[in-house]
Regions:
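A short helix-coil junction within the Rossmann-fold of NAD(P)-dependent oxidoreductases
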Residues: 56-57, 73-74, 100-109, 123, ...
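Active-site loop of short-chain dehydrogenase/reductase
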Residues: 30-32, 59-60, 105-119, 153-157, ...
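Substrate-binding pocket helix/loop in short-chain dehydrogenase/reductase
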Residues: 74-75, 82-84
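C-terminal helical subdomain
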Residues: 160-161, 178-212
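Short-chain dehydrogenase/reductase
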Residues: 1-57, 70-71
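Catalytic loop of short-chain dehydrogenase/reductase
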Residues: 106, 112-153, 165
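Hydrophobic positions on the long internal alpha-helix
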Residues: 49, 64, 97-101, 105, ...
């Protein structure tokens, strides 16, 4: 049983697929899927999406924080509107989703929170020139670090997952060099397989990790 909550309710030529087409694929694979139109910047929409998920499936066992905004421009070119957007979606979004899902996760027998964010590495090479994006993305990792400490005693696993190489997605094609970069990327399925491995482990004691 999977709920997909996102803004993508209509086709975008640059980013193929919608919450509806993704749910259709899940159903074809034999699963139950619930598409939920949701803008992660707005608390009420996230709260409604989480509530509908719990009502539809009888609870929530797993939260995956995959929503992310990316803009790799440097400080001279990155406008504050885009800077704020990345922080609203990335760090704040991960924190908000965890906060609102927590009452349901507490009732699960094997609760997990998995966030797509990098290991915390303060080497300056990860901050320049894309400082705005790095701060926002590392904010998601700080959510993992803090919640793992806070929720571990409650038996809730909180971990992050990050690919060692770029992944062949629409974002990579549009922002990181187009088709020329894709040939050096891994397929998205490798991330899905890694997530499945993490989320099928016992939550107790399996927390605070930054998996690569």
């Amino acid at each position: 049983n999977i709920a997909i909550a996102a803004k993508s309710t209509s086709e975008n030529p640059k980013i193929p697929g919608t919450i509806f087409s993704a749910c259709d694929q899940l159903k074809l694979a034999g699963g139950q899927a619930l598409p939920l139109a949701c803008d992660i910047r707005f608390d009420d929409q996230v709260e409604q999406a989480i509530s509908k998920t719990a009502q539809a499936f009888g609870g929530i066992d797993i939260l995956i924080n995959n929503a992310s905004a990316i803009d790799l421009r440097d400080i001279s070119d990155l406008d504050m509107k885009r800077f704020d957007l990345m922080h609203q979606i990335n760090a704040r979004g991960a924190y908000l989703c965890a906060k609102l899902a927590l009452p349901y996760l507490k009732q699960s027998t094997n609760p997990h929170i998995l966030t797509l964010s990098p290991p915390l590495d303060l080497n300056p090479k990860w901050f320049a020139p894309n400082l705005g994006y790095s701060i926002a993305k590392y904010g998601m990792s700080l959510v993992t670090l803090g919640l793992a400490r806070d929720l571990g005693k409650r038996g809730i696993a909180v971990n992050s997952l990050w690919p060692e190489t770029a992944i062949a997605t629409a974002a990579v094609t549009n922002l990181l060099g187009g088709e020329a970069v894709i040939k050096y990327c891994r397929k998205p399925e490798i991330v899905a397989d890694a997530a499945h491995l993490i989320l099928t482990r016992l939550a107790q004691g399996n927390t605070g990790n930054f998996y690569i």
